[in-house]
Amino acid sequence: MTQQIVWTPRQSAPKAFPERQALMPIWGGIPIPRPQWQNIWRQKLPHAADSDALAYLHIPFCANHCVFCGFYRNAWKESYSSVYTDKIIEEMAAEAEIRQGNGKIRAVYFGGGTPTALQTQDLARLIRACYQYLPIADDCEFTIEGRMSHFDIEKAQACIEAGANRISIGVQTFDTAIRRRLGRKHGGDEAFAYLEKLCEINAVIVVDLMFGLPNQTDAVWQNDLERATALPLSGLDTYAFNLYPMLPINRMVEKGAFPAPPGFDVQADQYAYAVETLAQKGWNQVSNSHFAYPDRGERNRYNTLVKSNIPCWAFGSGAGGNFGGFSYQVQGDLDSYLATPKGEKNIAFMSGHSPNKTLLGQVQHDMETGCLNLSLFDGNAAAQKLIAQWQAMQLFEEQGSDGLIRLNTSGRYWSPTLIRKLMLTLPTQEKDQTMQKLSSEQQIMLRQSLEKNPGQVLEMLAAQNQCSFEDVIRCLPENCIRQTEGSRIVEILQAVAAWDEAVTFIAHTPDAIVEVTGKLPGGKVGRGFYNFDHPETDGGVHGHIYYENCAAIYLLERPFMGKDTCALNFINRNGGAMFKIFVGSDEAGELKQHQIEAMRKLFEAA
């Protein structure tokens, strides 16, 4: 830091792990075949209120796409406001007629997207509808997530008058130059002045800050904290910036338009500085990322409870929820959601909860509040070994008389990685083969989605739709696809090898993505395999392929991660990807056009 603070390992341990990564949200779930979804929904919905729950309403619109954000879905249009609000209210009303039980909603969260993009009258009536159709607890925390654009003080006051009691504003940083590069229209001084006025209304006001942003020096981070704590805020959230591959900012970094974000050495120190500074200023740490100032009403209830797998009712396009031992996602395609017949739940994904999912909720909740119950891993030698290693690394404090170990500042910073590693020590659950053919409706929706954005991760779409990789390929725009018989695998592999030029060979499995760039070696068939010649030099592709498993070969030409790509995709009899071969690039980083033409000719020959 600017003040040259020397942190102890308990405060900052930047070299503890090579990466800081959480589990996928769907981890621990057992996929349920699509034909069963509606029956399960009808059986479970009457019992949704058998216990207390949370409610999440998703507003999937943004006025612009901030380059650091991975939650952008739909561009905002004023015409959406009343139509979308009507549809969510209709969705809530239909479920209210069926639900039974005495459970209460302990927290409501309007997330997005940008919920505050809705027009004032629509946002207010959606809040009132929650009180009409949901069993809201007397002490319910009711949060509206928003940003300064489209959310003036009058609209904020209308939200409070309608029944909200907590407002969360994503500031990220008060540094004007960084804000502008991130896609934020207002400068830092404007943000500060806005928050001063917002804090005058009778509500809990929370601000989100990010650390580890590109160009965010230690001095900038210190100033961000100073400015935030100078405001009469109730809560303050500090999140580490993650450079996920699909974010627009990643393309900017690759092209040199934005500097690379700082590494863990800086992030860990900035987190330690935030924890230390906020404690000195009288703030209480209520979770790994959340801080509350005493006697200003901040409870952080939703953010803490949602990680414990407490039931959460989901409403709106793209919203995710769970109850009755299963998780689900509401249809994320906006047009499809808006066209949902009255009284129906348009479900896009459903999975059952395995015992591992239940345990994950306990571990996540405990670690969010800064502790770990060792008894949860009794008999798990692998987990116990990890915990002992982490204690030696000084990520934990000594075990207390209550059987809990406390995470210190370093442990809390690395908690996503700790949770991930602990859960991956558990035995995997046997899963039914739930892969199925796409329905005509699914095909239409996938085609529309891929027409808008053909650069999506096809493997992820296959998992979400419980279909094969090949089924997703067939939904790509026609100008992206060429197909030939799988029986030509040997011919095509030998043709590529004859180029004597570098290509990229990729094998993508559920457990790894392996890439090798170099000349593809020749090969020949023998003993049921296509056997690559093994060159004397080290490295390169070598091994054996069950060539008879190849049922189809596709040439895909499409954008991916901001770049043009051209690749051969070899498909097995189950519709899965055996491997892929991507066209090489020249010294300027451009695809080699003569390789593209050579691949096309291979398919013209068919």
Question: Where are the model-predicted features located?
Answer:
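Flexible, acidic/Gly-rich N-terminal and inter-domain linker regions that tether
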Residues: 1-53, 63, 101
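Short, amphipathic alpha-helical interaction segments positioned at domain boundaries
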Residues: 410-434
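C-terminal scaffold of the Radical SAM
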Residues: 76-98, 104-376
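Short beta-strand motif preference
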Residues: 55-57, 169, 570
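Short helix/loop capping segments that flank catalytic or ligand/cofactor-binding pockets
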Residues: 315, 323-325, 416, 515, ...
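Canonical Radical SAM [4Fe-4S] cluster-binding loop centered on the CxxxCxxC motif
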Residues: 49-85, 176, 180
